Amino acid sequence: MNAQPPVIIVFGAAVRADGRPSTAMRLRVEAAARFGTALEDRGEAPLYMPTGGVGRFGASEASVMAGLLRRLGVPAERIILEETATDTLASARACARLLRARGHAGRVYAASSAYHLLRCLVLLRMAGLDAHICPPPRLPASTSFRRRWYWRLRELVALPVDTGLMLWLRLTQRQPPGARGPDARA
């Protein structure tokens, strides 16, 4: 067993106007909880880091996901909220910053929708984390052929844009790789 517990980083999705999670968010959280249970069965008690700030409606994505995790049986003390990020790149950077501040240098797992996982993984690794993927939700968030392809094609643009931005941030020392201490910026 590792000295540090693995951390499952759950990437946010929309919160509905009534404060309920979108289907994509619910499926991501359920997949993360299922994977966390599998880790527990292997003797590892993971921490969960839902990430996502306030979108168009009241509550932060992270707080809504934390509520879902608690309803799925995850103890509150194993949940670390990251409530500032407004997109995937900001989530990767903010989670890396939070984990460094906690002295965490162990494994992290990205939990998201299948179409989104590659970008999450690449950005977390570029942020200096030992990142892996959590098995994605078993069902797509949308059954519409057009919607599913929209999200996949969106990733074709978002992946090179976000990796280019992360590379620029690292090259300009706005995020030193493996940075430690109070001066570490992510």
Language model: regions and residue ranges:
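A structural signal for short, hydrophobic/glycine-enriched beta-strand patches
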Residues: 1-149
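A transmembrane-helix-recognition feature enriched in membrane-embedded lipid enzymes
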Residues: 145-175
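Active-site cores that bind ATP or allylic diphosphates and position pyrophosphate for catalysis
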Residues: 178-186
